[in-house]
């Protein structure tokens, strides 16, 4: 079953999302997925939609929202802040726990790229049952303040990203969230996945995340996969790794 849903975040803005629910049963383990920078709840070439349907067939509900300022949700892209993303994640998880399709004790937080960075940062706060990180984009933090200040020194406060207005204020806010220290404190099980052909997130970044989780992180690579897992093989492997991880924790 697929449902379109709307919720209000803590600032009163409407977030619009999609929920995929298995057909039989009442309360299911639920994956809350966070999309990447300039992305949306469907993902690159609908990869999140595909994975949500796959996991639904195996007994897992999936919750996917457009973050504030993205996709169909309220706001403009320039209104987005990293602090706001973290608040949205917490609000979405709290909403999910109240829904009759979700087991509130089995909420899994997932994210790709910037969404992975955000999910890792939010995890010590929201304490999900498990955490799944796909090529977490910690690299966007490094030099973020310097980039903003260099633009402002030239009198530029906003960039044009293929039609999306991106203000330097985002990077000033982002600077408050050093990726690895911000992720410390989560003690649950973690799945970390990277494609070996990812040119945006390197192996060292993933090993740094792996080191934070006290032996509870299962780091897997997909041979030849790029940052978006943009091949039929990569998608199938991604789905397989996620399902194996989930079933190792939760018996459906």
Q: Which residue stretches match the model-derived regions?
A:
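The serine-hydrolase catalytic nucleophile loop
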Residues: 38-52, 67, 204
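The alpha/beta-hydrolase serine catalytic core
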Residues: 15, 126-221, 225-249
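Conserved alpha/beta-hydrolase
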Residues: 52-74
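N-terminal cap/lid segment of alpha/beta-hydrolase-fold proteins
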Residues: 1-26
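Short beta-strand element of the alpha/beta-hydrolase
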Residues: 27-36
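Alpha/beta-hydrolase fold nucleophile elbow
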Residues: 101-113
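Alpha/beta-hydrolase active-site loop
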Residues: 79-100
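Glycine-rich nucleophile elbow surrounding the catalytic serine of serine-hydrolase chemistry
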Residues: 111-121
């Amino acid at each position: 079953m697929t449902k379109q849903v709307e919720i209000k975040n803590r600032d009163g803005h409407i977030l619009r999302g999609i929920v995929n629910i298995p057909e039989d049963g009442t309360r299911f383990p639920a994956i809350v997925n966070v999309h990447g920078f300039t992305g949306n709840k469907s993902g690159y070439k609908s990869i999140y939609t595909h994975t949500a349907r796959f996991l639904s067939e195996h007994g897992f509900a999936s919750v996917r929202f457009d973050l504030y300022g993205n996709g169909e949700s309220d706001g403009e892209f320039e209104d987005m802040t990293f602090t706001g993303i973290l608040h949205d994640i917490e609000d979405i998880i709290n909403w999910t726990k109240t829904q009759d399709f979700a087991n509130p004790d089995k909420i899994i937080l997932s994210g790709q790229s910037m969404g992975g960075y955000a999910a890792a940062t939010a995890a010590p706060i929201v304490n999900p049952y498990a955490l799944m990180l796909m090529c977490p984009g910690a690299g966007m933090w490094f030099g973020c303040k310097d980039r903003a200040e260099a633009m402002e020194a030239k009198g530029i406060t906003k960039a044009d990203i293929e039609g999306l207005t991106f203000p330097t204020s985002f990077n000033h806010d982002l600077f408050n969230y050093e990726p690895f220290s911000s992720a410390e404190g989560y003690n649950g099980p973690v799945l970390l996945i990277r494609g070996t052909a990812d040119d945006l997130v390197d192996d060292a970044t993933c090993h740094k995340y792996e080191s934070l989780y006290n032996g509870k992180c299962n780091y897997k690579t997909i041979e030849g996969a790029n940052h978006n897992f943009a091949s039929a093989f990569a998608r199938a492997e991604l789905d397989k790794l996620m399902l194996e991880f989930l079933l190792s924790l939760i018996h459906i």
